Swiss-Prot record:
Gene for this chain: gltX
Motif 'HIGH' region, residue numbers: 12-22
Name of the protein in question: Glutamate--tRNA ligase
GO BP: any one term: glutamyl-tRNA aminoacylation
Top-level taxonomic group: Bacteria
Species in which this protein is naturally found: Pediococcus pentosaceus (strain ATCC 25745 / CCUG 21536 / LMG 10740 / 183-1w)
Stated family: Belongs to the class-I aminoacyl-tRNA synthetase family. Glutamate--tRNA ligase type 1 subfamily.
SUPFAM superfamilies reported in the protein's UniProt record: An anticodon-binding domain of class I aminoacyl-tRNA synthetases, Nucleotidylyl transferase
Catalytic activity: tRNA(Glu) + L-glutamate + ATP = L-glutamyl-tRNA(Glu) + AMP + diphosphate
Keywords: Aminoacyl-tRNA synthetase, ATP-binding, Cytoplasm, Ligase, Nucleotide-binding, Protein biosynthesis
């Protein structure tokens, strides 16, 4: 990339919590800035006051930090281009709106919401795409003046609309999609740049902020393509150069084949949801970066530092990115297996406490028992909340045996193995992994039964499961009393 000052931004609205798609936007801007040794700016676009939620901004900031991102400027890191909340920049926008009105490039519009809705319905009934029709079209200056005076007398507050140039093409070379162009007649007519409450709309504020903050590149979601020609018009009207744009592909839900929608509750879509399940931030980050960007080679597991080093915006995909929850689980499992024991212990223990399986502030002996239990299942866990399901046997006893498992117990070898094991267990001095394994080997020697025919009846009889972690370790943690109780119950059932 040619030498230039690189400044990019992530600019969320505090109308909700950090979504997977927004996290991806933040990450791609972050990687671009860090790869080219530029600046990454966090800006809060809170102009839609009615939709902002109380902890929206805090959620965005907390979850971005949890993912491992930091920024050079933002609400919590003031710089020379601040303020970094749009609600605090109203004094910057107003003179520019006044300028456009004075130059005849924007004007006051007094159409009410009811009139606009009626206009749209009429257009739909006529088979037209809804668009704003100039309310002053065909009026003489005197008639226009009277119309405005009547609206003011009725107490109607105006919006400010930008006057869309006619017969003009707006085009740009998109860093992801290639060349894109729009005809000015296709964007829906003159559009609002200032709302009735005096706040600027998104399309106006974002242009002013990006220009004032000297943003060089804008990477954002595909859904912003239609906003770009409107923004290019405003840049042109104010005599400013536009930044370079890159619009990232849609994210598709692999389960439905449809665009990922915040209203689709069939799939978890917010970073906080994954945090609460015990996903690791570096795994989430790894997965999100692969949504629409591909590294060179076959490997898919990289650290953030490695992603920064290898990042190339030319490898951003034009095709929709597939959100595959199973792939996310696989990636997180790779990180869980490689993670420090204490880190997984802390996360999984918290899951057990929150589920009411272990009391708060457990005694040291209980903590040590839980550590062994968690380590037993560590390699199986895709995320640490699974520990609650995986360890059900150790807290609530075994589940009902399914038909396939019952078939394993219906063989001629099952009952002799279980009876021999009961005797061996009864004679053990200490019920630990070493002695349990020795007892099972003694059963093998006594009965001549080995392999699957030896191990499977024991596992099913005591755990009611056909699969699980190492059996001797599992039985030690289950304890002598419960292991013998389950074993004897099965012997009685089969006898």
């Amino acid at each position: 990339m040619a030498k230039q000052k690189i400044r990019v931004r992530y600019a969320p609205s505090p109308t909700g919590h950090l979504h997977i798609g927004n996290a991806r936007t933040a990450l791609f801007n972050y990687l671009f800035a860090r790869h080219y040794k530029g600046k990454f700016i966090l800006r809060i676009e809170d102009t839609d006051q009615s939709r902002n939620i109380a902890d929206g901004e805090k959620s965005q900031i907390d979850n971005l930090k949890w993912l491992g991102m930091d920024w050079d400027e933002g609400p919590d890191k003031p710089g020379e281009y601040g303020p970094y909340r749009q609600s605090e920049r109203k004094g910057i926008y107003q003179p520019l709106i006044d300028q456009l009105v004075a130059e005849g490039k924007a004007y006051e519009s007094y159409m009410t919401e009811e009139e606009l809705a009626a206009q749209r319905e009429e257009q739909k009934a006529n088979g037209e795409m809804p668009h704003y029709v100039d309310e002053y079209a065909g009026l003489s200056p005197e008639q226009k003046e009277q119309k405005i005076a009547d609206a003011k007398a009725a107490g109607i507050e105006p919006v400010i609309r930008f006057k869309v140039p006619t017969n003009t093409t707006y085009e740009w070379d998109d860093l992801v999609k290639g060349h894109i162009s729009f005809e000015s007649e296709t964007i829906g007519g003159d559009f609002v740049i200032q709302k009735r409450d005096g706040m600027p709309t998104y399309n106006f504020a974002v242009v002013v902020d990006d220009h004032m903050m000297e943003i060089s590149h804008v990477f954002r979601g595909d859904d912003h393509v239609a906003n770009t020609p409107k923004q290019l018009m405003i840049y042109e009207a104010l005599g400013w150069d536009a930044p370079q744009f890159g619009h990232m592909s849609l994210i598709i839900n692999t389960e439905t084949g449809k665009k990922l929608s915040k209203r689709d509750e069939s799939i978890l879509q917010f970073i906080e949801q994954y945090r609460s399940l015990g996903y690791l931030p570096e795994a989430m980050l790894n997965f999100i970066i692969l949504l629409g960007w591909s590294p060179v080679g076959e490997s898919e597991i990289f650290t953030l530092r490695e992603f920064v080093k290898m990042y190339d915006e030319k490898r951003l995909s034009k095709s929709p990115a597939a959100f595959d929850a199973k792939k996310l689980e696989w990636i997180n499992n790779q990180y869980v297996k490689a993670a420090d024991e204490d880190r997984i212990m802390h996360s999984a223990l918290l899951q057990l406490i929150n589920a009411g399986k272990i009391e708060k502030n457990p005694a040291p002996m209980k903590v040590e028992w839980a550590r062994k239990l968690i380590n037993l299942f560590k390699r199986q866990m895709s995320y640490t909340a699974q520990i609650v399901e995986f360890t059900e046997l150790f807290f609530n006893g075994p589940e009902n045996i399914d038909e396939e498992a019952k078939e394993e117990l219906a063989t001629d070898d099952a009952l002799p193995v279980l009876k021999a094991l009961e005797k061996q267990f009864s004679d053990l001095p200490v019920f630990d992994t070493v002695n349990i394994l020795a007892a099972i080997k003694a059963v093998q020697k006594e009965t001549g039964i080995k392999g699957r025919k030896l191990w499977m009846p024991i596992r099913i009889a005591i755990t009611h499961e056909m699969h699980g972690p190492e059996l001797p370790e599992s039985l030690e943690l289950l304890g002598y009393e419960l292991s013998m109780q389950h074993l004897r119950a099965m012997i009685e059932e089969l006898s």
